[in-house]
Swiss-Prot record:
UniProt catalytic activity: N(2)-formyl-N(1)-(5-phospho-beta-D-ribosyl)glycinamide + L-glutamine + ATP + H2O = 2-formamido-N(1)-(5-O-phospho-beta-D-ribosyl)acetamidine + L-glutamate + ADP + phosphate + H(+)
NCBIfam families: FGAM_synth_II, PRK01213.1
Name the record gives this protein: Phosphoribosylformylglycinamidine synthase subunit PurL
Family as reported in the entry's similarity comment: Belongs to the FGAMS family.
Species lineage: Archaea, Thermoproteota, Thermoprotei, Thermoproteales, Thermoproteaceae
Coiled-coil boundaries: none
InterPro entries assigned: PRibForGlyAmidine_synth_PurL, PurL_linker, PurM-like_C_dom, PurM-like_C_sf, PurM-like_N, PurM-like_N_sf
Main localisation: cytoplasm
Length: 693
């Protein structure tokens, strides 16, 4: 059933009776870990989320960040890991649909999607099956609703062979006056619009709150309908000014939606379930209550404004019903053909008891003594790694130009840049990052690294970071070491957000990411959003013929958890790179002072200095000659100089630039030296083939 004995006792005690079948379904769904966050919310409360430009932070379906006077941006991240493991096409597609609907709840028009994807090794048949279907699911849904996929990252690791991590972020924009009013009064109607309810997604939230053991029920997987998703986008554009509130009907179905609405507004709900429009007339009332049928929204509207909503719903042929209303009481009341089937106090409906699990620290092993390998072979191995490879074969399957807002396209720069036509040349810069190896070795420092990396990506392109959302994905919290890793990851995010002065305005926790008793490497993704005053000045990761090549920052001998250590030596050990927050903030100021004066820029991160330089050569189609030993460094080992993933660094190119000059761009060959010694030489076309996924 999904409820613990203690939870059942609390329910019986508070109700003063045995719960009905519908109430048991209600609590099983809404008190699941997926919906209630009962093992995590006490830690998440510590995350800083406020700033003068944050209009609405965590706590509702989507935040709002002011990027110009009267212009708001909303962005939100969602995971769909368990569904994507079992039915990768529909799991990924419904993940995209769900995050789009979250953005619709604030009246925003979705303008972009980003995806952070983690799969098993690309040569593994099962991982390849998941990979290809996830990509197709994202592509089909995004393309059909007209929202471009503008960026993301793809990671490959054996831990994700059977338990992929599938994260989708949606960005939307809305004028302040178009945001729904945000208040509710007794007598206001609850209108359910979209697909008729059926049995699809039954128990989806409970399914996402347990580990995978093989042979999972496909009935728990929702099915996407992008045509209806597009209709809902069109409806919201027309009615956001006349409705009071919009709520996504997602995880937990009506049970969660009604519990959250009554809790947010401290008002009772009276809901006649038999008046709900359905596609499956044989569905039981308790099934309708927790069904996670996709492409549905709840609109809260006053009776006098109802014609405004009904006109739009009819115009776009969106099915709807008016089964509920708000009342002046302290209860969630659900009726079925005149009979009460749910009668729960609001405080109990949304009051899953919190759980603090035991914690057990993990101590990573130190890096053993490793010989310095033949450098040219080591470079080839790292550059051909799927994790650092160019992902053109993936993003070319997405329509990233629909809406003609994408100023910096996938593969062109460190982050996506989106035009905001409402305010001239003003644009958004957005990027998501994660490194499961880092968060495995040191979850606190690893989570902070994910934040810093996304922050630096936004900064290097030319954005001023404003806000962040995060996604924490771990195994079962009942495992002391897993729960410790989760808590440490939250502390790392808290530290980074505080030091960088970038509030965390939303997030998602996904637990029980295990297969056959084996938890995944903890994976913390952070998406940072910033703004740029003039999108035409955004930096791309390239250079022009004759440009000088500069490096900013110091390379340290930091190869713990690095691509080099894993791919060349087969070792996962050490600690992630250290962080100097002041140095990271300085990068924002430096790049801002050079905007429009340099040809391009890219950060130095995964795969180290050699990878950053190689990507710029490929993007440009122009070679160059670089003396890496001119780069400021605190290591004497050449392999560490090339492959260290130290923070606080970026490459800039142009006639002049910030930092230390280490080379020049020209010709068709990528030539790397140390002093007068040649250490690596490849043609740009050969390099491109080497780094293709």
């Amino acid at each position: 059933m999904g409820l613990t004995q203690r939870e059942l006792e609390i329910i019986r005690e508070r109700l003063g009776r045995e719960p009905t079948a519908a109430e048991l379904a209600f609590f099983t769904s809404h008190w699941s870990e997926h919906c209630s966050y009962k093992s995590t919310k006490m830690w998440l409360r510590e995350l800083p989320g406020s700033a003068p430009w944050v209009v609405r932070g965590r706590g509702t379906d989507a935040p709002l960040v002011e990027v110009a006077h009267g212009l708001y941006v909303s962005f939100k991240i969602e995971s769909h890991n368990h569904p994507s493991a079992v039915d990768p096409y529909n799991g990924a597609a419904t993940g995209v649909g769900g995050i789009i609907r979250d953005i619709l709840t604030v009246g925003a028009t979705p303008i972009a999607l980003l995806v952070n994807l983690h799969f098993g090794p690309p040569e593994d048949p099962h991982a390849k099956w998941i990979f290809s279907n996830v990509i197709k699911g994202i592509s089909d849904y995004g393309n059909r609703v007209g929202v471009p996929v503008v960026g993301g990252e793809t990671w490959f690791d054996e831990d994700f062979t059977y338990t992929p991590i599938v994260l989708a972020t949606c960005v939307g924009v809305v004028e302040a006056e178009a945001v729904p009013k945000g208040y509710v009064e007794p007598g206001d109607y609850i209108v359910v619009a979209g697909l008729g309810a059926d049995r699809s997604g039954l128990g989806g939230s409970a399914f996402a709150s347990k580990t995978l053991e093989g042979g999972e029920d496909l009935g728990a997987i929702q099915v996407a309908d992008p045509l209806m998703g597009k209709k809902l986008i069109d409806v919201v554009k027309e009615v956001s000014r006349c409705v009071k509130f919009i709520k996504d009907l997602g995880g937990g179905g009506l049970a969660t939606a009604l519990a959250e609405l009554s809790h947010w507004f401290s008002l009772g709900v009276e809901f006649h379930l038999d008046k709900l429009h359905v596609r499956d007339a044989s569905a039981l009332p308790e099934e309708l209550l927790i069904s996670e049928t996709q492409e549905r929204l709840i609109f809260v509207i006053s009776p006098r404004d109802l014609p405004c909503l009904e006109e739009a719903l009819r115009k776009y042929e969106v099915p709807y019903s008016i089964p509920g209303r708000f009342v002046k009481s302290d209860r969630v009341l659900v009726m079925w053909k005149g009979v009460k089937i749910v009668d729960i106090p609001i405080s109990l409906a949304d009051g899953a008891p919190e759980i603090l699990w035991p914690q057990e620290p993990y101590q990573p092993s130190d890096i053993p003594e490793i010989p310095e390998p033949p450098i040219d072979k080591a470079i080839d191995i790292v550059l051909s790694s799927p994790n650092v490879a160019k992902k053109e074969s993936i993003y070319m399957r997405f329509d990233f130009d629909v809406g003609v807002r994408t100023a910096v396209k996938p593969g062109e720069g460190d982050a996506a840049v989106l035009k905001l036509y409402q305010r001239g040349q003003l644009g958004l810069v957005v990027k998501g990052d994660a490194n499961p190896r880092y968060t495995f070795l040191d979850p606190r420092l690893g989570a902070a690294n994910a934040f810093v990396k996304a922050y630096r990506n936004v900064a290097v392109v030319g954005g001023v970071p404003l806000a962040a959302v995060d996604s924490i994905n771990v195994g079962s919290p009942e495992r002391p070491q897993v729960y410790w890793r989760f808590v440490q990851a939250v502390q790392g995010l808290k530290e980074a957000a505080t030091e960088l002065e970038v509030p965390i305005v939303g997030g998602k926790v996904s637990l029980y990411n295990e297969y056959m008793g084996r938890p995944i490497k903890p994976t913390v993704a952070v998406v940072v959003l910033g703004k740029i005053d003039d999108v035409s000045k955004a930096n791309r990761a390239l250079w022009h013929d004759g440009d000088k090549i500069y490096i900013w920052g110091v390379t340290k001998g930091e190869v713990g958890g690095s691509e080099y250590l894993k791919r060349v030596h087969g070792i996962l050990a050490g600690r992630p790179p250290s962080i100097d927050y002041a140095a990271e903030k300085e990068i924002v100021a430096v790049i801002q002072s050079w905007l429009g004066k340099i040809s391009g820029a890219t950060d130095v991160g995964l795969g180290g200095l050699i990878t950053a330089l190689a990507k710029m050569a490929i993007n440009s189609g122009i070679g160059g000659e670089i003396d890496v030993c001119k780069a400021p460094a605190e290591t004497t080992r050449l392999d560490y100089l090339l492959f260290s993933e130290s923070n606080g660094r970026f490459i800039a190119t142009g006639a002049e630039g910030p930092g230390v000059a280490i080379g020049e761009a020209y010709g068709e060959e990528f030539v790397v030296k140390c002093g007068g010694t040649l250490i690596y030489k490849r043609g740009v076309e050969e390099l491109k083939r080497l780094m293709s996924l």
